[in-house]
Amino acid sequence: MAKNLNFFSSGKLLISSEYAVIDGACALALPTKLGQSMKVIYKKEPGIHWIAKDVNGSIWFEDHFQINDFHSNSQTNETTSRVQKILLAASKLNPDFLVNHTGFLVETQLGFSKDWGLGSSSTLVNNVSQWANVNPFYIQKKVFGGSGYDIACAQKDNPIIYQLIEQRPKVEDVAFFPPFHEHLFFVYMNIKQNSRASIQNHYRGISDQERNALNALTKRFLRTKKASEFQALMLAHENIISNLIGLPPVQQTKFSDYEGVVKSLGAWGGDFVLACGPKNSKAYFSEKGYAVCIPYFELIRREN
C-alpha cells in the first residue's frame, strides 16, 4: 500500500493593491504562519472519506465521495460542491492521480478560524494540487476566480510581490522586515468578507496612472524604515483605493480617534485591517469591541 501523505499551505494577507491586483497592479502579500494542513491516508474501503476540522479540532464538515466522479450521496451543500469542483479540476489536469487506488481518508486541519479570511479555500486548493501534482493557479481560476495571489502565498513562507502580467502570475520573493514591527497589528473586524462579491459590487477598474501609483507605493512599503513614513504610505494607498471603489477608508468610519493609521487589507469592510500605531494598541481595539488584535510577528514569519 502507498505511503500516507501530508501537506501544508500558508494563509495570506494582502498588504497593497487590493482590488487592483486583478488588473495587473503590483501587490505586496504576506504568507502567514497559520495555514491549513491536509493528511491523505490510503484505505481499502472504496471512495473518499473527507473530514475537515476547524482550528479547535472540531469537525465542521464531513462527506463521502465516489472515487470515479466525486459524486456524494449526502444532500449537496456549498462545501460539498466546492470540494467536488476542486477534485474534478485536479483530476482533469492529472487523470492518473487517483488511479490504482481504492479509497482514501482525507483529513484537513485549519490553523486559523475559518471566519478570518486568511485563505481556507486557497490553502485547500494548494494542498489538493500538491496531492494531485497539478497547477494550483489553474484550479483556483477554474473554481473561484480572482488574481491568484492567495495561491502564491499558500506556496511560500516569505513575503512576495505578486503581479499578473498578461494574466500570468509573476511571483518575486522580497525582504520585508519592518524595524517598527512592534507598532504593527492585524485587527479582525468581526466580519468575514466575500472578496468576489466586493469586487463585483464596488470595483470600477483602474487607470494606468492609478496602477503606476499603486506600484510605486508597493515598492516604497518595502523600503521604508520609519513608522511615520509607513503611515503616510498607508494613507496615500487608502485614498487611491477609496476612489477606486467609492467607499470611505475604514479609519474615517470606525477608528477616527486612533493615535495611528489603520489600513484595510483585501476586500474592504471585513476580515483584517492593518494598524500602525502605539505599542499598546491592543487595549484601544479591545475597548472598541475588536478582541482579535495580533502583533505583526505573531502572524507573519520572521525572515532568516
Q: Where are the regions a protein language model picked out?
A:
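DPxDG-like acidic metal-binding loop motif
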Residues: 115-137
